[in-house]
Amino acid sequence: GSIPCGESCVYIPCISSLLGCSCKSKVCYKD
């Protein structure tokens, strides 16, 4: 599933990618 990480990635990458989040549709999600 895709859980929103509460972070957008329109201008900058997901800082929460350190926690396993990735950018999808301008919003960071965790798979």
Swiss-Prot record:
Give me any GO biological process, just one: defense response
- Where does the record put the Cyclopeptide (Gly-Asp) cross-link? 1-31
| PROSITE patterns for this protein | CYCLOTIDE, CYCLOTIDE_BRACELET
Keyword annotations? Disulfide bond, Knottin, Plant defense
PTM characteristics: This is a cyclic peptide. Contains 3 disulfide bonds.
Disulfide bond among the record's keywords? yes
Q: What disulfide bonds does the UniProt entry report for this chain? A: 5-21, 9-23, 14-28
Summarize the protein's role: Probably participates in a plant defense mechanism (Potential). Binds to and induces leakage in phospholipd membranes, particularly ones containing 1-palmitoyl-2-oleophosphatidylethanolamine (POPE).
Q: Domain notes, please?
A: The presence of a 'disulfide through disulfide knot' structurally defines this protein as a knottin.
Similarity comment: family membership: Belongs to the cyclotide family. Bracelet subfamily.
Know the name of this protein? Cyclotide mech-4
According to its UniProt entry, this protein's organism is Melicytus chathamicus (Chatham Island mahoe)
